[in-house]
Regions:
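Residues forming the flavin
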Residues: 1-281
Length: 281
């Protein structure tokens, strides 16, 4: 992208707002990462766009249970990111609690890095698919239809009380651990889509709001001037895997690129969606 003459690529920059007539505010952090360097710290961009693509991703939802604010309780994706990107372990013995498949990747990742994962507590009566089988093959205990009744500990996690997902929350057993990775699923980041008038629709399958493709933000002539791509579009998967999907990301990105090119009066080049392997352990 940096080598293309018709592309302006800016890292460390976010879309702060999308307004009427394709008016976009961009907020660039120029020197926040090197405070002593000369020049401006921040820069505000004012952009007029013929079409806008929001590829803002998704945010992981937490789960509600007693003690979910005790230090050592974190989102499953955050624990995985610390381990993979920075080599930082949040705990030596992590219990994973989830209602979707994606958190299984965290358990598998931690186990492969030599850390202990005593149990995965899945709120669903069945789920996990091939990821659950991979976790079991690594010696991880998988409990379906289970949840956390409470986290044991004060200033840090020392264990969890396990309960049935359906019931009164009575503790069935306690598991010693020093970290909890929780995942309540994923929700598209729809702030910019909604900011400029785009409507949302409820998705019963994934229990989240997502952009309504039939009611996008529209310009003064009634034309759609914003499209969403990837997880931001709410298109997560076409398979039995209940989580984030690279295939769907590529597919919706291609569709959004075509929409942008057509909006500018150009003819899009036909490209095939790359073949990807999901569930990279």
């Amino acid at each position: 992208l940096e080598a293309m003459e018709n592309v302006t690529f800016r890292a460390r920059m976010m879309g702060a707002g999308v307004y009427d007539h394709g008016y976009v505010i961009g907020y660039e952090r120029v020197n926040d990462h090197q405070p002593g360097a000369p020049g401006p710290r921040h820069r505000l961009w004012r952009i007029r766009a013929g079409h806008v693509v929001t590829a803002t991703g998704a945010i992981e939802r937490p789960l509600s249970f007693a003690g979910n604010d005790i230090p050592g309780v974190m989102l499953a994706s955050a624990i995985r990111d610390y381990a993979v990107n920075y080599g930082v372990s949040i705990g030596d013995r992590t219990v994973v609690v989830t209602n979707n498949d994606d958190a299984y990747l965290t358990a598998i990742c931690l186990k492969n890095m030599g850390l202990d994962v005593p149990a995965i507590l899945d709120a669903r009566n069945s789920g996990g698919g091939e990821l659950a089988e991979a976790a079991k093959a690594l010696g991880i205990r998988v409990e379906t239809g289970k949840a956390i009744a409470k986290v044991i500990g004060g200033k840090r996690v020392t264990g969890v009380g396990v309960c049935a997902q359906a019931g009164q929350g009575a503790v069935l057993e306690e598991i010693d651990c020093d970290a909890v990775a929780m995942s309540g699923g994923w929700s598209p980041v729809v702030h910019l889509w909604s900011h400029c008038g785009g409507k949302l629709v409820w998705d019963d399958v994934y229990s989240h709001f997502k952009p309504d493709v039939h009611n996008p933000p529209k310009g003064d002539h009634g034309e759609a001037f914003v499209s969403a791509a990837g997880c931001a579009a709410g298109s997560q998967t076409e398979t039995d895997f209940e989580g984030l999907s690279l295939h769907e990301t590529f597919r919706t990105a291609t569709e959004s690129a075509h929409a942008a090119v057509k909006a500018l009066g150009r003819k899009p080049i036909e490209v095939s969606v790359p073949t990807v392997q999901e569930h990279d352990h």
